[in-house]
A protein has these predicted regions:
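Conserved Lys-Pro-Asp/Glu-containing loop-to-beta segment of HAD-superfamily phosphomonoesterases
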Residues: 89-121
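Short amphipathic alpha-helix with an adjacent loop that forms part of the alpha/beta core around
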Residues: 97-104, 145, 150-171
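Active-site neighborhood of HAD-like aspartate-dependent phosphohydrolases
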Residues: 1-35, 45-46, 183
């Protein structure tokens, strides 16, 4: 079965910017001006070039005049190689997997920074990878696949691809492939 990769935007493909008030999320230019997490962005571009089945799966504020439009502008700028048909936007608060084109299998990977999204996905039978963006996973309680935004992302992601498709791995953590891997199956 061919794996599918569903990648979150806010805090994953794009930075998560600290805000003083939720009203900032409704301001024109907020989403369009987010900086990309460049290591992950480059890895996603490489996966698309390799013919992998890649989707964006991102929540948006449905009561915002700008959020959805600006997320598409952002994707057009930073990831133009991803067709519009592969962009799935979910109203904030809704469960992401309910918006997929078909039922989740263990070969459907969600890369997301938000634990609730990952737990929902895993409960439906998908495989989850928590994206570490520098502001999440502070307490280190996540017990599952981890992918860190750093220069080793390509090596680490390739390790996941090479080792997790035959049988999904329940949990492991690594920071650098040159170090020992901690695995728990």
């Amino acid at each position: 079965m061919k794996p599918r990769f569903f990648i979150d935007m806010d805090g994953t493909l794009a930075e998560w910017r600290d805000i003083k008030s939720n009203s900032e999320l409704y301001q024109k230019g907020y989403y369009e001006s987010l900086k990309p997490n460049n290591y992950l962005l480059e890895e996603v571009k490489n996966l698309i070039k390799e013919g992998k089945d890649i989707y964006i799966l991102s929540s948006f504020l449905s009561d915002s005049d700008y959020a959805l439009k600006e997320k598409n502008i952002w994707l057009n700028k930073y990831l133009p190689e991803l067709p519009v048909q592969k962009r799935i936007f979910v109203p904030y608060g809704d469960v992401k997997y309910k918006y997929l084109p078909s039922k989740i299998t263990s070969f459907d990977y969600l890369i997301d920074d938000h634990t609730k999204n990952l737990l929902d996905w895993k409960e439906e039978g998908g495989t989850v990878i928590k994206f570490l963006n520098g502001i999440n996973h502070i307490k280190g309680v996540w017990q599952g696949l981890l992918l860190r935004e750093d220069e080793n992302i390509s090596k680490n992601f390739n390790w996941i691809l090479d080792n997790c498709f035959k049988e999904p791995v329940n949990s492991f953590e690594f920071q650098n492939l040159d170090e020992d891997l901690e695995m728990e199956i």
